[in-house]
Each structure stands twice: as structure tokens, then as C-alpha cells.
Swiss-Prot record:
Keywords: Dioxygenase, Iron, Metal-binding, Oxidoreductase, Vitamin C. It comes from the Bacteria. Its EC number is 1.14.11.-. Residues 80-175 form the Fe2OG dioxygenase domain. This is PKHD-type hydroxylase Syncc9605_1577. One of its GO terms (biological process) is intracellular iron ion homeostasis. Fe cation binds at H98, D100, H156. NCBIfam families: PRK05467.1-3.
Length: 222
């Protein structure tokens, strides 16, 4: 399983963030300032100053939600959430095909995530497209408060916004397990074992599965 979409933030928190994002005179900066040389050529959006009070509040809210969510923790084996950015894309703005840098000064980038903050009917366009292999792509345009996680090694883009304003928070996860295939395998084992536990209760055989899962994480961790 390469991608995870999940309801991360409750509606009341999203509504409060939306109200604050609509305030005038927020310190928006050219999004190219945080892109690598190649990505900057295809990036056209704006990002909230990372040191602004609202940016820090949104980053802390989403980081806390990610690191405390059982499904996200199982999927990503999160060691660290870092380098969060609040992004705004208006009509005519987009982010062309690119791959994220493998690391930043804050940590390795094993998984990327986008948490959607705008109501779906408040803007047109602005889909996140992720290449899944060859010419196949997956499209993500999620309700506010939902997040998509995906390997940072994938090519992805944001299609042009046709109208309205698209607000998202993006960031990266350094995982205990670097390889996406290994994380996917471990996630499936964990999900299967927990499903058996919920349906049939504890057993000696299930203990062996959990033991093997734990030792596999230990062996594959970096």
C-alpha cells in the first residue's frame, strides 16, 4: 500500500483554521523560496511565513495529530514530522511535476503528506496528482481535514487552480524504516494481526505474529 488517505483533523478544528487563514495581511511568501532549483522552475504558489504565529499553530496542530494517530503511525512508522509549510494556490497557480528533495536540514524525507484545509466547493482545479509507475497516476482532492501520505520518491504535481483559493499544509516524515516496500509489508502485517486480534482475541499463534512483526521492524529500521 503506497498511499494512505485518512481523516486527520475534526471539523471544528478545520473551521477555526479556515477562519484564521481568511484574515487580511497574513505574511504570504513566494513558494519558490522553499523549492529546490529544478522544482522552483515549475512552482507557482504562496506559502505562509514558517515563523508566523498562524503557521506555527497549524504546523503544531497537524504534527500532533499525525504523531498520535494509530493508523498514521502504523503506516509511516513515524520517527519525526518536520518542515511543515502552509500553502495557498489561487487562480492560475500550480506546481508542476517534481520530486521532493531526499532530505532537509530538519531530517530525511521518506514520506510526504498534504493535509487539505479548504472546502472542496470553495475552489476549482488544484488536484494533487501522483505518478504510480509508468504513465499511471492517482488523483487526490480531499475534503478539509483529510490527509494523504505518499512516498517522497514519487513524481507528483498540483494541477492549476481555476478559481478560488486552495489552502493545504504540506510536510515530510522521517520514518524508522526508509524503504517504501518494507513499510508497506510491515503495515499489512500489522493490519492483519490487529484484525485477527479484534475478531478472535489473543492467541499464542497471534503472539508469534506480533513478535515477528516487532523483530522485522527492528531489523529493517535505520
Amino acid at each position: 500500500m503506497e498511499f494512505l488517505t485518512h481523516s486527520l483533523l475534526p471539523l471544528h478544528e478545520v473551521c477555526a483554521l479556515q477562519q484564521r487563514l481568511s484574515a487580511p495581511n497574513l505574511p504570504w511568501r513566494d513558494g519558490r523560496l522553499t523549492a529546490g532549483d529544478q522544482a522552483a522552475l515549475v512552482k507557482k504558489n504562496y506559502q505562509l511565513d514558517p515563523n508566523a504565529e498562524l503557521s506555527l499553530a497549524i504546523s503544531n496542530c497537524i504534527s500532533t495529530a499525525l504523531t498520535s494517530d494509530p493508523l498514521v503511525k502504523s503506516f509511516s512508522l513515524v520517527r519525526k514530522v518536520h518542515s511543515l509549510l502552509v500553502s495557498r494556490s489561487s487562480a492560475g497557480e500550480s506546481y508542476g511535476w517534481h520530486v521532493d528533495n531526499p532530505f532537509s536540514r530538519n531530517g530525511r524525507r521518506d514520506l510526504s503528506f498534504t493535509c487539505f484545509l479548504s472546502d472542496e466547493d470553495s475552489y476549482e482545479g488544484g488536484s494533487l496528482m501522483i505518478q504510480t509507475g509508468g504513465e499511471d497516476t492517482k488523483e487526490f482532492r480531499l475534503p478539509p481535514g483529510q490527509v494523504v501520505l505518499y512516498p517522497s520518491s514519487t513524481l507528483h504535481c498540483v494541477t492549476p487552480v481555476l478559481s478560488g483559493d486552495r489552502y493545504v499544509c504540506v510536510g515530510w516524515i522521517e520514518s524508522y524504516v526508509k524503504a517504501a516496500d518494507d513499510r508497506s509489508m510491515l503495515f499489512n502485517i500489522d493490519a492483519g494481526a490487529r484484525g485477527l486480534l479484534a475478531r478472535h482475541g489473543r492467541s499464542d499463534e497471534l503472539d508469534l505474529i506480533f513478535q515477528s512483526y516487532t523483530n522485522a521492524v527492528r531489523r529493517l529500521s535505520s
